[in-house]
Design a protein with these regions (language model features):
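Short, solvent-exposed loop/turn segments at the edges of secondary structure
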Residues: 20, 72, 195-197, 294
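Juxtamembrane segments of multi-pass membrane proteins
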Residues: 141, 145-270
Length: 521
């Protein structure tokens, strides 16, 4: 489906859309687990296959639609960034996640309508001893040790928050390339012997269309090059100044002592012998260093792949040096090259991902506000989904995993999946409370048993799916796998323990029952 949508829209596969197939599988599997478990539960109650299939559509279908739509809206916020790659990711994810719902809600009942009725062996998993014992322990903790649950989750949140401050953005040109690959080893060789392979260029132009080849200007360029010598990250520069220095050495019988800027008179003589014209094959190199109008020149360096943080620091220091040497009213100086483009692109992509992730959290929260029109219910629904994100961010800070495009994506993916379990839990709980007119405790007891089983099955399946990513050769994909798995496991714990504990805390509130049973849109 995803490949078909990309083809219809004319989008090409990229780093981000490449993460959608496993994500769609995860969402589809989660939907299937909830639908099939409900089908087995209903069939075990009355033994009527048609009635069971009808009820999974009426009872689980609405919750599944709301879950998928909320997730799709969260991912769809990427469309509103100004980065084409993220726009495509937002459009494709929004369309395909909603399509997954229709495939599940139509395909699963239709398929099971042709299959034989479930056998006792097939529905035996509903009585799994280990899972039922675990859910029994969950209920015991929720009903008897709420304060202990609050204490552990508050402690976990505080501890994680302390490590969040260690988190920092950092990206390299060859960030996710395997360290053992031939490509990476070749890049290391060039970096060690040739000071890297990333072009770092400085373009100098005169404002008044004056001659760039004057002694005054070239002397400033020479001063800039000498100032940049203190940076071991830079290679030896290639510029018209280097050509002039070499020419000065040549006319002085190759004496190394004359490899320096000549005086103004000698410089004029040397420059007169260097006509700048692209048609002259002998001067093709010079035409790449100084333009034909003689109003601009280029200083070309190679720089090591030092990472976005160090590169940003170097850029700021170079900018200070440039401003000190070249008066802004006389010269226009610009840093360019692949390294500058990488830095700007990485900063822009990181900012877009960060803002899109933030807005996805906000929009999902607003969507939940339409589902649960009560401030307290929104807070109760959001808290169990924020804590896993803090735990993941704290874990990244503790282990020194930097923020980069491949890791920041974890927060949006994980939040979109964990919020599904929250919505499913609350909708099921409210249905139990309204239909049977039970107390909050009785409704929670039934909800934990009904939703808990599917939640455990789905989280185990999803985490196993993301765990496969850890076997990837690319570090970004590895991090995406184990970080998403960690977030989902923490989210499951929060939805099984913290969420019902907070709902139970509303039991004696004056308006609790009205808030909990208020009609869902």
């Amino acid at each position: 489906v995803m490949f078909g949508v990309c083809g219809i829209l004319g989008y090409k596969l990229n780093l981000l859309t490449g993460t959608l197939p496993p994500l769609l599988v995860v969402i589809g599997v989660q939907n299937a687990i909830y639908l099939i478990n409900k089908y087995h539960e209903e069939y075990r109650k009355h033994g009527n296959k048609a009635k069971a299939l009808t009820r999974i559509i009426s009872r689980v279908g609405v919750a599944t639609f709301l879950i998928n739509f909320t997730t799709a809206v969260g991912f769809g916020t990427f469309y509103f960034t100004k980065t084409q790659m993220l726009e495509h990711y937002g459009v494709v994810s929004f369309i395909t996640i909603n399509l997954v719902f229709f495939i599940n809600i139509i395909g699963i009942p239709a398929l099971y309508s042709f299959l034989p009725v479930p056998s006792d062996k097939q529905i035996a998993h509903l009585d799994n001893k280990n899972i039922n014992q675990f859910l029994g322990w969950v209920k015991f903790m929720v009903f008897n040790h709420k304060r202990r649950i609050y204490f552990w989750f508050i402690a976990l949140t505080v501890l994680s928050t302390t490590f969040v401050f260690r988190l920092h953005p950092l990206a390299y040109m060859v960030d996710d390339v395997p360290r053992s690959s031939k490509l990476y080893q070749d890049l290391l060789y060039f970096q060690e012997h040739y000071k890297g392979v990333m072009p770092y260029e400085i373009v100098v132009r005169t404002h008044d269309d004056g001659d760039i080849g004057t002694f005054e200007t070239l002397d400033k360029v020479n001063r800039l090059q000498r100032a940049l010598k203190k940076y071991p990250e830079f290679s030896k520069p290639m510029s018209v100044v280097e050509v002039v220095c070499y020419a000065n050495q040549t006319v002085n019988e190759g004496d190394p002592a004359f490899y320096r800027m000549p005086n103004a008179l000698d410089l004029a003589d040397i420059m007169a012998r260097m006509p700048i014209t692209k048609s002259n094959e002998k001067n093709q190199m010079m035409s790449g260093l100084i333009d034909s109008s003689r109003t601009g020149l280029r200083i070309s360096y190679q720089i090591k792949d030092v990472g976005s943080t160090s590169l940003d620091s170097i850029n700021k220091e170079v900018a200070v040096i440039i401003d000190r040497i070249f008066p802004k009213d006389e010269y226009a100086v610009k840093v360019t090259g692949t390294s500058a483009v990488f830095m700007k692109g990485n900063s822009y992509l990181f900012g877009s991902l960060g803002s899109a992730t933030f807005w996805s959290l906000i929009i999902i929260t607003i969507t939940m506000g339409f589902l649960f029109p009560s401030i307290r219910m929104i807070v109760i629904a959001v808290i169990p989904n924020i804590i896993p994100l803090l735990v993941t961010a704290g874990t990244m800070g503790y282990f020194g995993v930097p923020l980069k495009p491949s890791t920041i994506l974890v927060f949006s993916i994980a939040f979109g999946i964990t919020v599904d379990a929250t919505i499913h839990f609350i909708i099921t709980f409210r249905r139990e409370l309204v239909k049977h007119n039970k107390s909050v405790r009785e409704a929670l007891n039934g909800t934990i048993v009904e939703v808990g089983l599917s939640m455990i099955y789905s989280m185990v399946a999803i985490c196993a799916g993301f765990f496969i990513f850890t076997f990837s050769n690319f570090q970004g994909t590895q991090a995406l796998g184990w970080l998403t798995g960690l977030t989902l496991l923490t989210g499951m714990a929060a939805n099984l323990f913290l969420l019902p504990a907070m709902i139970l805390s509303l039991e004696n509130s004056l308006n609790a029952k009205e808030e909990l049973t208020e009609q869902v849109l």
